[in-house]
Amino acid sequence: EAYPQLRTIENRIIEDELSEETGNAGQTSLVIAQDSPVRVSLDQLYGIEINDFAVSVAKAALWITEEQMLRKTQEIYVDYDFDFLPLRSLSNLHEGNALKTDWSEVFPDDLTYLVGNPPFLGARNQSKEQKAELLEVFDGAKNAGNIDYCGAWYMKAARFTQGKRTRCALVSTNSICQGEQVANLW
């Protein structure tokens, strides 16, 4: 949902800039352009997803959305040929376990925003494999086994963003701010 929202904002900016250039607010105008006015790109999106089918679905959804947004841009900026093909590889979307993946090998150092929706599993609902992943992320810290599974994403995000200007937002339950896990997380 983030990509179409960003492109919608960008289209508004393109339309406003075009209106300022031509003096024709709200009217389509012919301005000869050498370069595409589009700056928000699928190449700026990165991701790690454990489910291969979900990766394929995400790529297909992004390709469809890109085409839809380029058509809307074409309505504003009629003189530029927004060619959708060939499809981009979307190689920045990685299939893998986010807790076992070195994020510095997937995400660029100058990443602006890190947004995620990690799985919520209380300490008593984790499989042996998930518990082992959690303990590995927390380097076996005392009481780490009592942390909600999504807490491991917070730790990975904190380590990845340390010393960087990257802002982070993760969807999670309020349980990560309660009980024994508070000491290890916060």
Task: Indicate residue ranges for each PLM-predicted region.
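SAM-dependent methyltransferase catalytic region
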Residues: 1-186
